[in-house]
Amino acid sequence: MSGVSIIRTLLVANSSLLAVVPAEKIMAGVIPIGTVLPAIGITSISGMPKSTIRTDEVTLWTDRVQVTVEAKSYPSQKSILALVRDAIPAKRGTVGSFYCDSISPDIEGPDIFDSEPAISAGSQDFLVRYVR
């Protein structure tokens, strides 16, 4: 869950995003049914260690992390996804208690709609490489 923790740490530290989505609505895991929108869920899609010649206690790990935005309208969902992308820069260094080798955007997911209740959802994946 370290990739998820890294992404959440960056999101809740971004004042522009927090002006639209409060920190308590930026959560690790799936957004619960009935949550007042907008909300952001952060989930781990996959992870794998990087094979290196070096064999010590430090392992470089890559997680694919998906950030899903649920909002009441399509324009709102798209603008929040843009804020999410802005809040997660290509970065190297310490984030929370983890050392990040890199964070890079990956695939943007499909737009998903539910008419009852009115929910517009979309996602953005990130590749998070960190020392585990």
Predicted regions: what is each one?
Residues 1-55, 75, 91-99:
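Small/polar-rich, solvent-exposed N-terminal microdomains that initiate assembly or binding
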Residues 10, 26, 51, 61-64, ...:
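Generic preference for well-ordered secondary structure
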Residues 33, 56-58, 115-117:
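Sterically constrained small-residue positions within well-ordered secondary structures
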Residues 52, 83-87:
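Signature of extracytoplasmic/envelope-associated structural regions
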Residues 58-73, 77, 84, 119-130:
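Oligomerization/assembly interface segments of phage tail-like spikes and tubes
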Residues 67-74, 79-80, 101-113:
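Repeat-unit-sized solenoid/scaffold elements
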Residues 86-132:
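Acidic-leaning, charged glycine-interspersed low-complexity segments
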